[in-house]
From Swiss-Prot:
GO molecular function: serine-type endopeptidase inhibitor activity
A Gene Ontology term for the protein's cellular component: extracellular region
Keywords: Disulfide bond, Glycoprotein, Protease inhibitor, Repeat, Secreted, Serine protease inhibitor
Name of the featured protein: Ovomucoid
Glycosylation sites: 45
Compartments, as annotated in UniProt: Secreted
Length: 56
C-alpha cells in the first residue's frame, strides 16, 4: 500500500484556477484542487498531508 501524495514543490501560488478536482486533507477538509491543497500544505509547514483523492 503506497502512501498517496502530491508534489507541492512548485507552491505556494498566489492564484488558483477554478479547476475542481477535490482532494481530502489529513485535517478532514476537502480542498477544491491540488493548488488549494498545496497552498494549505505550505501554510501548515508540511504538517498537512493528503488523506485521499476525492471529497472527504
Amino acid at each position: 500500500f503506497a502512501a498517496v501524495s502530491v508534489d507541492c514543490s512548485e507552491y505556494p501560488k498566489p492564484d488558483c484556477t477554478l479547476e475542481y478536482r477535490p482532494l481530502c486533507g489529513s485535517d478532514n477538509k476537502t480542498y477544491a484542487s491540488k493548488c488549494n491543497f498545496c497552498n494549505a500544505v505550505v501554510e501548515s509547514n508540511g504538517t498537512l498531508t493528503l488523506s485521499h483523492f476525492g471529497k472527504c
